C-alpha cells in the first residue's frame, strides 16, 4: 500500500484566470482544429467535441444533428449492421466524416465492427470503449485493431494515468479516452472506490500522450460549457460529452410521463437499465456501476450545441486565445472554493 500526497483536482476545484486580450468579439475566435493522427496518418478538421457512445446520447439522429456544427458523435455499439447500412444510405459524406464507430473487445464486437467499416470508406474513426482500460486483454485488442485497420483513427479507453496512456498509444491508439468515474450517471467511484479527479487526469495524460505524438479526449465530468473550456485548458485535444447532450429529441432515450409531464430516461452504460436492455440483466458476479435518471425533455440539441460553442468562444476571449488550439497555452488555473453565486439556484 502507498499514498500519493499531492492533491488531485476536478473541474469544480478551479477557475480560469482572465488575461489581457486583443480580441474585439467572440466571433473572432476559431473553434475548428486540424489534426493529423499519429498511427492512421489521417487528417481531420472540425470542432473537437464528441457526443458520448451511450445509447441515450450517441445515436444516428445525434450524429446527423451535430455534424452541422462540425462536432463528432461516437455512435453507440448496439446498432445492427443493417441499421448502420440504412443510416449510411441516408447520410451525406459530411455527416459520415463526423462519425465514430464504437466497439467493445469481444471477438463478436471485432467482427461486427469489421462489417460496419467495410460498408463505407468514409467511416474513418473507431472508438474502442471499455470501463477499465488497464487490462492486458484491452491493450492486445487495441494492437489487433491497429493491425486490422492501419488507416483508421483509433480512439481507445478509458484510463486516467500517464503510463497507461503511453501504453495504449504505443499499442496503436491515436487518441486515448481519459476518465474513470466522473460521468453524471456513473457510480464506479462509489461502488469500487476507484477513480481519479478529471482535471488532474486530463493534465497528466495530455502530458504523457503529447510526448509520444498521441492525443487525448477528456471523457466525463463536464456539467457546464465552462467545464468544457477547463478540459481544453488542461490540455485535452477532444472533449466527450454525455449528460450535457442527454434528454434531447435526438438522444434516443425512452420517454416516460409522470403527472402530465414528459421525461426522458438517461442511464450509464454499466447501469442495471443498460445491462437489462442489452445483455439480459446484471451478471451475478458483478455490480451495476451506473444509475438511471429522468430528465425533463430539452428539445432539439442544436440549442445546447450553440450554448456550448458560445461558452467556449467566450472563454477564449477572456484569456486572449484567438483559436481553440491556443486555449491551453493561455490557461492559468486558480484553485477556488466556490464556482458561482447560488442564491437563486432553487427558484
From Swiss-Prot:
Cross-referenced CDD domains: IMPDH
This protein's encoding gene: guaC
Catalytic activity: IMP + NH4(+) + NADP(+) = GMP + NADPH + 2 H(+)
Subunit: Homotetramer.
Binding positions for NADP(+) per the UniProt entry: 108-131, 216-239
Enzyme active site: 186 (thioimidate intermediate)
Binding residues for K(+): 181, 183
InterPro entries to which the protein is assigned, alphabetical: Aldolase_TIM, GMP_reductase, GMPR, IMP_DH/GMP_Rdtase_CS, IMP_DH_GMPRt
Family named by the database record: Belongs to the IMPDH/GMPR family. GuaC type 1 subfamily.
GO CC annotations on file: cytoplasm; cytosol; GMP reductase complex
GO molecular function: GMP reductase activity; identical protein binding; metal ion binding
SMART domains membership: IMPDH
Function summary: Catalyzes the irreversible NADPH-dependent deamination of GMP to IMP. It functions in the conversion of nucleobase, nucleoside and nucleotide derivatives of G to A nucleotides, and in maintaining the intracellular balance of A and G nucleotides.
Disulfide bridge positions per record: none
GO biological process: IMP salvage; purine ribonucleotide interconversion
EC id: 1.7.1.7
PANTHER family to which the protein is assigned, alphabetical: GMP REDUCTASE
The name this protein goes by in its record: GMP reductase
Keywords, comma-separated and alphabetical: Metal-binding, NADP, Oxidoreductase, Potassium
Gene3D superfamilies, A to Z: Aldolase class I
